[in-house]
């Protein structure tokens, strides 16, 4: 968190292009229809908002860094249906099973227990939710990333990594 607080004012200059590539890769496998409620866990400066906010009933961005949320707040001024929450991804102050789409872009390698984080994401996602998770290649092997998603009981619908610095997985909850 401290790293993101320190770099919040320059985050977009450093990472916007890389983040956009990840988001665009994910959006190729995500239906562009009406979204319902969208959650962006680890929303950072809110780069995802321009891809989903216009088609969503409401988009909620959560981040643990207050300073980076201030940058997201500026971006959210262009999107009246965006709400921001300062919270930990492992303990989100949200109801169960409400989000139709959950995005965790450049998040899980920054959490102490990625499976716990993914389980919390599943808790707030509805039964038919689309869950997008990215994992940096410098943090995970492909096999390790897939194993992590399986350990969290996520079904991988699409997986992309060509030309990216990360793996982009579009998932659903596994039926029990």
What are these regions (language model features)?
Residues 1-33, 47, 139, 165:
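Conserved class I S-adenosyl-L-methionine
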Residues 39, 45-91:
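Class I SAM-dependent methyltransferase SAM/SAH-binding core
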Residues 90-102:
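A short acidic, Gly/Pro-enriched loop at the edge of an enzyme's catalytic core
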Residues 101-113:
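A short SAM/SAH-binding and catalytic strip from SAM-dependent methyltransferases
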Residues 115-127:
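A short glycine-rich, Lys/Arg-flanked "PGG" loop and its adjoining helix->strand segment in the class I
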Residues 128-135:
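Conserved beta-strand signature within the Rossmann-like core of class I S-adenosyl-L-methionine
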Residues 140-152, 167:
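Short alpha-helix
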Residues 161-176:
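Core SAM-dependent methyltransferase catalytic element
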